[in-house]
From Swiss-Prot:
The gene is apaG. It comes from Bradyrhizobium diazoefficiens (strain JCM 10833 / BCRC 13528 / IAM 13628 / NBRC 14792 / USDA 110). Residues 3-127 form the ApaG domain. It comes from the Bacteria. GO terms for biological process: error-free translesion synthesis. This is Protein ApaG. PROSITE patterns: APAG. Pfam families: DUF525.
Length: 130
């Protein structure tokens, strides 16, 4: 599990290789990842946007930006958590992802929180990147 804490908001990530949706013969590798966001602060916050940088084993990067996560812009009161699962394909047997969420506090302040860099490794991978 990978973990980052920004302004008392914890983000954990658990990636999993999905062999049923992968094919080494077609250079298609797929991972799911489960993210848990926990608000340990004293103020209610809302996740507004996401920004991902996805890097494959050759160093090729893909940038993904968008509103919310999995179609939601969750609001987390102090002590609350939000969990979701999504997925990512790569054309190489390994890679990694890193990112940030833009949050807004109940007072209207916008700020970013880190998503920890996490490794995407398949059984076909000969070395671990992160």
């Amino acid at each position: 599990m990978y973990r980052a804490v920004t302004r008392q908001i914890e983000v954990t990530v658990e990636p999993n290789f999905v062999p049923e949706q992968s094919s080494a013969d077609r250079s298609r590798y797929f991972w799911s990842y489960t993210i848990v966001i926990t608000n340990s602060g004293e103020e209610t916050v809302q996740l507004k946007t996401r920004h991902w940088i996805i890097t494959d084993a050759t160093g090729r990067q893909q940038e993904v930006k968008g509103e919310g996560v999995v179609g939601e812009q969750p609001t987390l009161a102090p002590g609350e958590r939000f969990e979701y699962t999504s997925g990512v394909p790569l054309s190489t047997a390994s890679g990694f992802m890193t990112g940030r969420y833009q949050m807004v506090s109940e007072s209207g302040e916008r700020f970013e929180i880190d998503v920890p860099t996490f490794s995407l490794d398949s059984p076909d991978n000969k070395r671990v990147l992160n």
